């Protein structure tokens, strides 16, 4: 039976496979990428203000990371980073993809170039069956009708929402995240995506599979099932959030039960994470007290929950407090584990962190971690102390934030000040000069510029 990797749920040259992995059959890979989930949304990470027993069980069966970072504090670029192994601004996407005018106002492309390297292309070349199930948001939808179809990125089958080309009509009756006319109602969409994932795995048990399972929970509007709905509260209410999170957690549990029933749970590596931080944060409860939120490069916007479980391979019940990993590292790392090769000819931002993912040893990135979050009229949230400069760089425990004009420099020691309360820029002018020059030069020389 095939080994399986489930990624819940964003380096030049070829990657050599690990000797131990090379002796095994190729694993399945399923990526589950939760939408807008903060690190404080899971009870295995927080003080228990919400309960997520099924995801907690997943954590207890595997390895939990405290220093995993998304490649962007908002949807589209975070997905580009995970998919390509490159920082998303290098593909001309620095915020959520909008209609054409909105993308032009943001000076970004309308969609991810289909010539980009992708995890699916590499794994398909290595003999994998490939599927994308759930939110896409890397091009297509709204008034962008010329975006490449999802198979151009390496997927054999797909089911997607209105934020992508060729959306599934039974969940997309209108150009909006949810419509009362949908055949599959908003509160049943994660269950629908789980069903599709399990069906795909069942139909392809004769070969290794790579499946993106990208639900659109926990993105608002939060609309619970008929047991809660209709209610008079706002879609953004705390009660609605807790109800939807409870239902989402149950679907993760049902997914894991489905893997057991298919006989592949013991052969499944599970990585659970989120595309970006939470908004609203409910007074930073959803960020575990971290400053910032979705749309911010402070920790609340980019430090995500990250859980890895692979029974019999990864020791259960451990926490990694030292490894520092970015979403761009997943492409090279999973290729390493799966015996696949990175597509040649690209300057990858990601590094092979497979030994950390497998719990063999702690690893820290040797390359600087970079962020660029576009700033324009669309970004009216967050404000005040939660609103960060739009460029960021992390080197070791140092994290510097700055605007591309060189103004608004902030410097934090994340190891001793994870909530970014004490700006140390005045005490370390030489370090600030070095880091700000590095990230500003990167921004102006590496970003892909919209051409139309």
Outline where the language-model segments fall.
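Active-site segment of extracytoplasmic enzymes that catalyze sulfate/phosphate-ester chemistry
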Residues: 31, 39-118, 122-128, 142, ...
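Short, solvent-exposed turn/loop segments enriched in Gly/Ser/Thr/Pro and often Arg
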Residues: 44-49, 64-86, 94-96, 132-143, ...
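A short aromatic-rich beta-strand->coil structural motif
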Residues: 29, 35, 123, 135, ...
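Histidine-centered active-site microenvironments of extracellular/periplasmic hydrolases
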Residues: 143-154, 221-224, 234, 257-313, ...
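C-terminal cap/loop subdomain of S1 sulfatases and analogous C-terminal strand-loop tails that border
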Residues: 278-297, 314-323, 328-414, 445-446
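A short beta-strand-to-alpha-helix junction
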Residues: 47-52, 69-74, 106-117, 184-193, ...
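Formylglycine-dependent
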Residues: 95-129, 136-211, 215-229, 242, ...
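Bacterial Sec-dependent N-terminal signal peptides
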Residues: 1-25
């Amino acid at each position: 039976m095939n080994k399986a990797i489930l990624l819940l749920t964003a380096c030049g040259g070829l990657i050599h496979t690990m000797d131990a992995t090379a002796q095994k059959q190729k694993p399945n890979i399923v990526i589950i990428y939760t939408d807008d989930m903060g690190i404080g949304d899971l009870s295995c990470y927080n003080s228990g203000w919400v309960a997520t027993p099924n995801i907690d069980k997943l954590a207890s069966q595997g390895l939990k990371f405290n220093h995993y970072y998304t490649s962007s504090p908002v949807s589209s670029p975070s997905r580009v980073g995970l998919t390509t192994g490159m920082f998303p601004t290098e593909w001309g996407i620095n915020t959520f993809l909008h209609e054409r005018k909105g993308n032009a106002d943001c000076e970004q492309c309308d969609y991810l170039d289909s010539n980009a390297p992708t995890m699916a292309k590499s794994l398909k070349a290595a003999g994998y069956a490939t599927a994308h199930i759930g939110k896409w948001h890397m091009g297509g939808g709204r008034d962008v009708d010329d975006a490449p179809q999802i198979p151009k990125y390496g997927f054999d089958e797909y089911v997607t929402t209105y934020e992508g080309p060729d959306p599934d009509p039974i969940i997309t009756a209108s150009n909006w995240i949810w419509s009362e006319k949908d055949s599959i109602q908003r509160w049943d969409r994660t269950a629908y995506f789980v069903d599709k994932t399990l069906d795909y795995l069942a139909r392809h048990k004769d070969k290794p599979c790579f499946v993106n399972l990208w639900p659109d929970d926990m993105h608002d509007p939060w609309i619970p099932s008929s047991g809660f709905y209709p209610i008079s509260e706002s879609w953004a209410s705390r009660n609605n959030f807790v109800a939807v999170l409870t239902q989402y957690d149950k679907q993760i549990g049902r997914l894991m039960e489905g893997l057991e029933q298919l006989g592949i749970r013991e052969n499944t590596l599970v990585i659970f994470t989120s595309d970006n931080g939470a908004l609203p944060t409910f007074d930073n409860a959803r960020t575990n007290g971290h400053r910032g939120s979705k749309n911010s490069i402070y920790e609340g916007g980019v430090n995500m929950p990250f859980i890895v479980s692979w029974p019999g391979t990864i020791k259960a019940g451990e926490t990694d407090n030292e490894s520092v990993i970015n979403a761009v590292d997943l492409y090279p790392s999973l290729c390493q584990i799966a015996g696949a090769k990175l597509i040649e000819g690209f300057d990858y931002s990601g590094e092979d962190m497979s030994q950390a993912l497998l719990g063999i040893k702690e690893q820290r990135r040797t390359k600087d971690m970079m962020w660029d979050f576009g700033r324009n009229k669309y970004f009216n949230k967050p404000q005040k102390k939660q609103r960060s400069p739009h460029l960021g760089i992390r080197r070791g425990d140092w994290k510097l934030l700055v605007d591309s004009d060189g103004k608004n420099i902030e410097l934090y020691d994340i190891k001793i000040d994870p909530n970014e309360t004490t700006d140390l820029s005045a005490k370390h002018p030489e370090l600030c000069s070095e880091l700000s020059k590095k990230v500003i030069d990167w921004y102006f020389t590496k970003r892909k510029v919209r051409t139309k």
